[in-house]
Amino acid sequence: MDIKQPKKRITLGEIAQLAGVSKTTASMILNGKGENFRIRPETRQRVEAIAKQHGYRANAYARSLQAQRTNVIGMVIPDLANYGFASTAKTLEKLCRDKGLLLVIACSDDNPQQEKQAIERLLDRQVDLLITAPTHQDPSYYNQIIKHTPVLQLDRHIPNLELSYVISQDRPAIAELVAQTVAQEGLSEYYYLGGKLALSPSENRLQGFKQGLVQAGLDLNEDWIWHRDYQPDSGYQMLADIVAKLGRLPQAIFTASYTLLEGVLRYLTEHQLMDKLLSGQLHLTTFDDHKLLNALPFKIHSIGQNHQAIAQAMFGLVERYLKQEKLESHQVACEIFWR
């Protein structure tokens, strides 16, 4: 079926001509200022009727130039399918919507170049401020942005960059989970599968893991520490490489994200090793939680982030910025889910 080409959009000048008024008068009416300038009701009705008939919409960017605000917030996250980021974005979008703000979300795919492109496109749309989960630790690019547009950081933050952020307080919970798992299961080895070490959450989670081993009195073997990125395929491949090196499964694994856990479970399923979880020959723990873990026939202890509280804290920063109030960073506590 042929798709009909849309009709040419009517201009403000054409509406004014059809209504028999000046372009200035038509602009005042269509921007909701007709009554303020005491334009007669019948004139306002005539202009509005013509605009509606032709599907005319006032230029939001032109209005924003006058108001010095667009009421649009730009947000760049690394993975739209990631449960944590998706949950936070969903709550934040509703909070913005309820206050008359539009949250526009873009994805970086955890790629610095894609992050830059997404930011540039949002800046082209004159967003009032940016919320980003940076894919790198280099402050130079952001130093250029903040000269003109304010930036808040979510989940991750760049050191030596004076930006307010909202992150999870992950290190204490990870340390407690690791220490208690070692003690309860009598572990002599414990592998760590993490994402890019250049990212602030990766460093925090690794430090929490190491702290937990110290608390449990288990000496760290550097061969236990593995890093790639946070995609499920990386969890799969890291476990495959570990098994190839050891010739067996390790005693225990901590995955630094639920996405990495997905990859680990896929490896175990494809290699018919899920029974090792049931027999207790393999112990899995993870950062990030999902309700699905409650339905499994084996135990996977997890650490849940409070995505609603994270979104609320971030929205609080947005509101404070719009009110020109002082901004402060927030760390939101995590919760351990024992199973």
Say what each PLM segment does.
Residues 1-69:
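N-terminal helix-turn-helix DNA-binding module of bacterial transcription factors
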Residues 23-28, 65-79, 189-196:
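Short beta-strand segments enriched in small/hydrophobic residues
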Residues 84-98, 173-177, 200-219, 234, ...:
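Short, solvent-exposed amphipathic alpha-helices that sit
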Residues 104-124, 175-176, 224-246:
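Structural motif
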Residues 132-173, 178, 198, 259, ...:
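Flexible loop/hinge segments that line or gate small-molecule binding clefts
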Residues 164-192, 207-211, 232-240, 261, ...:
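Hydrophobic alpha-helical segments within soluble ligand-binding/sensing domains
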Residues 176-218, 222-223, 328-339:
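An alpha-beta-alpha
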Residues 244-339:
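Flexible loop/turn connectors
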